[in-house]
Amino acid sequence: MNSIQFPLLDRTTQNSVISTTLNDLSNWSRLSSLWPLLYGTSCCFIEFASLIGSRFDFDRYGLVPRSSPRQADLILTAGTVTMKMAPSLVRLYEQMPEPKYVIAMGACTITGGMFSTDSYSTVRGVDKLIPVDVYLPGCPPKPEAVIDAITKLRKKISRELYEDRIRSQRANRCFTTNHKFHVQHSIHTGNYDQRVLYQPPSTSEIPTEIFFKYKNSVSSPELVN
């Protein structure tokens, strides 16, 4: 049913009775039904949307996209993450049930990308907010690379112990890194300097003869039935 081999599988008898552990059974059920929460903000998410088509068909991996973090066990971040978006991303991750996994897709998510060079509002790596299981570099990565990342995550799930996973997540809570989010007053007050607007030349600066000559030469628009 599944091509991934379990290291803790004991033996298979002649009567087709499989002797295994509860941990392996839990891992098998989870890796065969990953429900991702799609957190896409940029062009990388368009590449992930290509997986829905018949050419790649990500339904064969049991992937069912969910719109609620409470029903998802995998969050896939794609695109630039800004300081203003960081609390929302952390909140979504916190609302996901355990065990949960993260795939960082694209250069903008992993390092901040080209937007982190001179930007003061870009998070330079989503792993400063939430723990990442699989890094998927590229700008943007191809759909084949996304499938490879999902396959690697499935292999990782098949070999892990549930207790170790929970202990690791509690010990390495990378999303608790403090960011100095200072509340600033809004600068968009609706007031603007009207003096900088473009002012057309006054008609008093144009000679009267030239003004009326130009006015008469402009024909009024005709309605066409």
UniProtKB/Swiss-Prot annotation:
Keywords: 4Fe-4S, Chloroplast, Iron, Iron-sulfur, Membrane, Metal-binding, NAD, NADP, Plastid, Plastoquinone, Quinone, Thylakoid, Translocase, Transport. It is an enzyme of class 7 (translocase). It is a peripheral membrane protein. One of its GO terms (biological process) is photosynthesis, light reaction. Its cofactor is [4Fe-4S] cluster. Its main location: plastid. Its EC number is 7.1.1.-. GO terms for cellular component: chloroplast thylakoid membrane; respiratory chain complex I. It is found in: Plastid, Chloroplast thylakoid membrane. One of its GO terms (molecular function) is iron ion binding. The keyword Oxidoreductase does not apply. Binds 1 [4Fe-4S] cluster. This is NAD(P)H-quinone oxidoreductase subunit K, chloroplastic. It comes from Nicotiana sylvestris (Wood tobacco). The lineage of its organism: Eukaryota, Viridiplantae, Streptophyta, Embryophyta, Tracheophyta.
